Design a protein with these regions (language model features):
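Extended substrate/RNA-proximal surfaces in nucleic-acid metabolism proteins
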Residues: 1-121
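Charged catalytic cores and adjacent phosphate/nucleic-acid-binding surfaces used
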Residues: 103-200
């Protein structure tokens, strides 16, 4: 806050809602005091036995592209559902494909699918998280942040996905500069599920 104290809000990451939206909604109904909900997808569909991206074995480039398409289908369903604050780490498959398996994958060629996701989010009043990815390539990176802005998106949070203390706050300022370079002039926090806009 303005007096130098850290404000602690209440939030959750709600993963895999696309497996059972009714269950996800029932869960949220039991937590009315939340300030912030990240909607996220970490698994592929039943075609891949709901396997978590983290555990997916090495594969060919064409198999990886099929996995990205499968993932984006679930992300689009989640975006259309829209009962959350921001969509977390849109380009998450790249973390595991590139950083864990040494591939050179991108979401290039999926512009239509990503645009559909962004339009659904904007229509539902949801935003996106720019995940600093513990200092690696942000999820999503500048190309997709620019597209989000061009489509009318304004709600963006910066998430460090820290998991351990040494990553808390990592690259937060640099990521805000990235947002600004993509035409996004505000970073958001949330209070009582409503975005609060802070000028960068």
């Amino acid at each position: 806050g303005a007096d130098g104290r850290i404000i602690v809000r209440r939030g959750i990451e709600l993963g895999e809602a696309a497996r059972d939206f009714a269950y996800a909604e029932a869960l949220l109904d039991r937590l009315p005091e939340l300030d912030f909900v990240i909607g996220s997808q970490h698994q592929l569909s039943a075609r891949y036995e709901w396997n978590d991206l983290y555990f997916m074995p090495e594969c060919t480039e064409s198999e990886a592209r099929e996995q990205i398409a499968d993932y984006l289908t679930l992300v689009l369903k989640t975006a259309r559902w829209g009962k959350f604050s921001v969509l977390g780490h849109l380009t998450l498959p790249l973390r595991y494909m590139n950083e864990n398996h040494g591939m050179h994958m991108s979401f290039d060629g999926f512009e239509d699918e990503v645009s559909q996701v962004f339009r659904a989010l904007i229509e539902n009043g949801c935003g996106i998280e720019c995940n600093v990815n513990r200092g690696n390539t942000p999820l999503p990176d500048g190309k997709w942040l620019k597209l989000y802005h061009e489509l009318g998106g304004e709600i963006v949070t910066v998430g460090t996905d820290a998991h351990t203390p040494e990553f808390v706050g990592m690259r937060a300022r640099e990521t805000q500069e990235l947002l600004k370079s993509c035409g996004l002039n505000y970073v958001c926090t949330f209070e009582k599920r409503k975005p609060v806009f802070h000028k960068i």
